[in-house]
Design a protein with these regions (language model features):
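Soluble non-cytosolic domains of exported or imported proteins
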Residues: 90, 127, 131-139, 242-247, ...
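Sec/Tat-exported extracytoplasmic proteins
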Residues: 145-152, 185, 252-256, 263-264, ...
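Zn2+-dependent metallopeptidase catalytic core
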Residues: 132-156
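Auxiliary tRNA-acceptor-end handling modules of aminoacyl-tRNA synthetases
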Residues: 1-129, 147, 151, 162-219, ...
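Short conserved micro-motifs at the rims of enzyme active sites and ligand-binding pockets
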Residues: 111, 135, 220-221, 302-308
Length: 610
């Protein structure tokens, strides 16, 4: 709306394109035209048109019993308010979104037998899906069947091929009675797992998972970059069908998880020790994270020579636990009385790292695209592998007679992978460990990451970020794909990282944590001192990157002194370091090469205090 400056609707240019009616829903596709103050060029009508679909869905006549959210278990949920509460306030209520699964045989279910649900969850595979990928789509859906057995159900989720028009002329993927996985021909590199739920109870009525064709490209590239050093099967852009198929299967499982009601659990990837991820027996049994719902896509920790390694994610113990909690049927209990049984289930497991849930915040153990319990060690292994990949990138991506287009694409994505490994460590600085818990459980939800670990992180960055990363600047490689700009790209990565570390938000958070959060965290003063000694180390050889970092650090310190939003406590420290930079630079203006003298002259100019 803001992009096009959309105003009122133009009724003369708006109309219904198509209307379809089914037993439980109506689908209306129409073109809506709006007056626009920022219409695209060469548009004399000053309007923009959009094709929009609206769905009108008949809700169930019989309400499904609700299940209240326990925040220690990740679940998509609806927020409601109870205005009849006796608590002298309106109570906020969270109701989870889930399918209506009820056992056919209540007596057998009560005896602990596996029982089929009255109405299983059925997904129809889009006929547009390439034939060779359909078995992997089916496996990705039905992998959850084993998980549902933990909740007492067998054959709870089923994958079927969509019938042809000859087989069933009334079948349509637009019919709300049929959930589906759609295969969409587009350059988008993604997959999604949306769902439609009853706003009264949270009952999931239908979902249409979408697989975008070009998502294959993302997985092909990242498989090579993140596992190629230790995984011979990944050392090509002609990824074997079985390997790509396994990746598709796991993406489908992830999206089905969303459609079942599960959100991302970004804490799950930090449960396993980093060194265990180098063990073939461990990874084959346990995977690389405790859930498929984390963004822990690849095992980038395993090193060349490690044997029988699992490189791709799979379902794990957290998936069993969360599905059992969400779908276990309690026939003799109400939504209120079942809370006791459900709470006991969570109390037993929620403090075990295998079953912890976390969605974000400032917790270094709740990150995306990471694996292992130690971000520093994991990133060390990741960068070590990436160096091997870069040294072989030309050979692995380009065949004789081909252009260097793929090499260029993979090199650019290499920078992105390297950046992720670096930022996994940056999050430790000023980090606060967050554990979702309730009163009565040991410890407290928030604790500062101890200073020793934060100093380890700074030392890692000193070696792997602030020092010139010559392995990313190999002229024999760069000369094939770029005529300019690589040095600037890498310097901008350093500058962006420095700005992140010395952001007002992070520094204020560190000051606040010093005074209000349990734990021996790193002080912001110690952080600034460590960075100063990193950038202005005695007798440190100067190259373009070091000089640029010294300038950027000086500019950042100077700017922070004048920031109104920064806690005043820190400004005297910053001013003292600004003076120290001036003093250090002043000493060096009369020694060394001309270029170095000029550099330090400039530093004295920008650090001088009027």
């Amino acid at each position: 709306k803001k992009q096009f400056g959309i105003g009122s609707i133009d009724s003369k240019r708006s109309f219904i394109d198509e209307l379809k009616s089914f037993k439980e829903n109506i689908e209306i596709r129409h073109t809506l035209t709006y007056r626009s103050s920022k219409a695209p060029k060469n548009n004399s009508t000053k309007t923009v048109s959009f094709q929009i679909n609206h769905s009108i869905i008949l809700l169930p006549t019989e309400l499904m019993p609700i299940r209240y959210l326990d925040p220690r278990v990740g679940w998509f949920n609806l927020k409601k308010y109870n205005y009849s509460s006796e608590e002298l306030k309106s109570d906020e209520i969270r109701v989870i979104q889930r399918w209506r699964l009820e056992p056919k045989d209540l007596d057998a279910y009560a005896q602990g037998e596996l029982v089929e649900p009255i109405k299983p969850i059925v997904y129809y595979i889009d006929p547009a899906t390439p034939i060779k990928w359909r078995p992997y789509f089916k496996k990705g859906i039905e992998d959850w069947a084993k998980v549902f057995e933990k909740a007492g159900f067998k054959n709870a989720i089923i994958a079927k091929s969509a019938p042809s028009e000859e087989e069933d002329p009334n079948f349509s993927l637009e019919d709300v009675r049929y959930s589906s996985i759609r295969y969409v021909a587009t350059t988008t590199r993604n997959a999604t797992g949306p769902r439609v739920s009853d706003p009264r109870t949270g009952e999931i009525i239908e979902s249409d998972i979408i697989w975008y064709h070009n998502h294959l490209r993302s997985y092909r590239n990242r498989y090579l970059l993140e596992t190629g050093a230790a995984n011979p099967k990944a050392r090509t852009l002609d990824t074997p069908e079985g390997e790509i198929g396994e990746m598709i299967r796991r993406v489908i499982s992830h999206e089905v998880g969303h459609a079942l009601g599960l959100p991302h659990n970004m804490k799950a990837s930090s449960a396993y020790p980093v060194d265990s991820l180098r063990s073939g027996s461990f990874t084959q049994k346990n995977g690389i994270a405790t859930t498929i719902m984390d963004y822990a896509r690849y095992n980038y920790v395993a090193q060349p020579g490690d044997e029988n390694i699992r490189f791709v994610r799979q379902l794990g113990p957290y998936d069993d636990y969360s599905i059992e909690w969400g779908y276990r049927f309690f026939p003799m209990k109400t939504s209120e009385t079942e809370k006791v049984s459900l709470r006991k289930m969570v109390d037993k497991k929620s403090m075990n790292p295998l079953y912890m849930y976390g969605s974000g915040g400032n917790d270094p153990k709740t990150q995306t695209e990471n694996i292992g319990d130690d971000p520093i060690k994991a990133s060390y292994y990741g960068i070590k592998n990436l160096k091997i990949v870069v040294s072989n990138l030309d050979e692995w991506t380009t065949k004789k007679g081909q252009s260097y287009e793929d090499l260029n694409e993979l090199y650019n994505e290499t920078i992105g992978v390297y950046r992720r490994y670096i930022y996994h460590v940056i999050k430790m600085i000023g980090g606060i460990n967050e554990t979702v818990m309730v009163k009565g459980q040991d410890n407290v939800p928030y604790q500062s990451l101890n200073a020793k670990e934060q100093k380890r992180a700074l030392s890692f960055l000193g070696q792997n970020l602030w020092q010139t990363q010559s392995w990313l600047m190999n002229p024999n490689l760069i000369s094939k794909i770029k005529s300019k700009g690589i040095l600037k790209v890498l310097q901008n990565l350093q500058f962006s990282a420095l700005n992140q570390i010395l952001s007002i938000r992070r520094l204020n958070r560190m000051i606040s944590a010093e005074n209000t959060i349990i734990g021996d965290g790193l002080s912001p003063e110690a952080l600034i001192e460590k960075l100063f000694h990193t950038f202005f180390k005695e007798n440190m050889p100067l190259d373009d990157s070091v000089m640029a970092l010294q300038i950027r650090f000086t500019e950042r310190v100077k700017k922070l002194v004048n920031e109104n939003e920064l806690n005043p406590k820190l400004k005297s420290t910053l001013l003292a370091f600004q003076k120290l930079i001036y003093k250090t630079a002043k000493k060096k203006t009369k020694i060394g090469k001309v270029s170095e003298k000029n550099h330090y002259l400039y530093l004295t100019k920008i650090s001088e205090i009027p």
